Design a protein with these regions (language model features):
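Terminal helices and disordered tails flanking the catalytic cores of nucleotide-processing hydrolases
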Residues: 1-93, 236-298
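Hydrophobic transmembrane alpha-helix bundles
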Residues: 30, 85-90, 106-114, 127-135, ...
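Alpha-helix termini
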Residues: 28, 35, 136, 152-155, ...
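Acidic/His-rich, divalent-metal-binding segments that scaffold phosphate/diphosphate chemistry
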Residues: 37, 44-166, 173, 178, ...
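Alpha-helical scaffolding flanking metal-ion-dependent phosphate/phosphodiester catalytic sites
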Residues: 111, 134, 138-145, 157, ...
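Intrinsically disordered, low-complexity segments enriched in polar/charged residues with Gly/Pro
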Residues: 3-4, 10-11, 81, 122-123, ...
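Residue-level signal for pocket-adjacent positions within structured domains
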Residues: 5, 13-14, 89-92, 141, ...
Length: 298
């Protein structure tokens, strides 16, 4: 299980002290935070924010222009996001991320959009696209509280530094619970679990039972992280190399194969149905020459 203590003082977007340095983030602490602050944040439709324009830019850039080539579906994705409401404090978190950590902000937007697209294409009545939009848009806001020197480190992380990285799902959970003024938020719980894996090898809880919303988020999260520039590697993964990793992870039972096949379908020009996907059996592209992800200094 990943560490649950936070080495720095943690504040919300309004400057309220939530957690003291080296205090454990637990359900008890979250209960205390909610009881103390009793946040009453009004909601706003995302159609009234700049998030919409920024998502449109993301789905029309790079590989995502190909993945959202079906204009009808792309318009549905945008429409769902426009009709989704968030607390104004969450929107402020996103606005702050856009200024201070634009890469994380853009990552959050495209993960939300891809996850919604999968929901639309699966056409499963049990999926609420607006619910997954909300989860996608908060799944990494906790990274805004991580030390920038750790986030932008180009050399291998120490075990302690990686432990700090692993706290961000807990910070996601704390912030969302705080802003929604409840410890029983499905959205906050989903944000907590976005680094879990179906074989129990993920973090921070190390659980194997993961709800379908989170299972949808996971391959989208991994894919964009791989094809994006990161300080700890020499260049991004190619689309093919990134998809190969998703396939390998699904074969190991770590992530949902159905959702991985959706991602493969989106990247192909002929857009086959996800049930007809037959992934390549061999790695087709080389990985970055320098990649310190998963490498520890001590």
């Amino acid at each position: 299980m990943a560490r649950t203590t936070w080495p720095q003082i943690l504040y919300d977007i309004e400057g309220n002290l939530l957690v003291s340095a080296d205090q454990e983030i637990s359900k008890k602490v979250i209960d205390e935070v909610i009881e103390k602050h009793q946040i009453q944040s009004s909601k706003i439709l995302l159609s009234q924010t700049k998030v919409i324009n920024d998502i449109q830019k993301r789905i029309n850039s790079g590989i995502y222009k190909e993945m959202f080539a079906n204009k009808e579906t792309a318009e549905k994705v945008i429409d769902i996001i426009m009709q989704t409401s968030c607390t104004k404090l969450v929107v402020r978190e996103l606005e702050t991320l856009k200024i201070n950590m634009p890469d994380t902000y853009n990552h959050i937007l495209i993960v939300a959009a891809l996850s919604i697209k999968i929901c639309i294409d699966l056409d499963n009545p049990e999926f609420d696209p607006q619910q997954i939009a909300k989860i996608g848009l908060v799944h990494d806001i906790g990274k805004s509280r991580l030390p920038i020197e750790v986030i932008e480190k180009k050399s291998p992380l120490t075990h302690n530094e990686f432990g700090i990285i692993q706290t961000h799902p807990w910070i996601d959970h704390l912030l969302v619970s705080h802003y929604l003024n409840t410890t029983k938020s499905f959205i906050a719980q989903a944000a907590l679990c976005h680094h879990e894996r179906l074989d129990g090898s993920g973090y921070p809880l190390g659980i194997a039972k993961i709800n379908n919303y989170v299972q949808t988020i996971i391959p989208c999260d991994i894919f964009d992280a791989l094809i994006s520039q990161r300080p700890y590697r020499s260049e991004p993964f190619t689309v093919r190399a990134a998809l190969d990793i998703l396939v390998a992870e699904s074969k190991k039972g770590k992530i949902n194969t159905k959702f991985v096949n959706c991602m493969i379908s989106y990247a192909r020009k002929d857009k086959p149905h996800y049930e007809d996907i037959k992934p390549s059996q061999t790695n087709r592209d080389a990985t970055p020459k320098i990649n310190y992800y998963g490498v520890r200094k001590d």
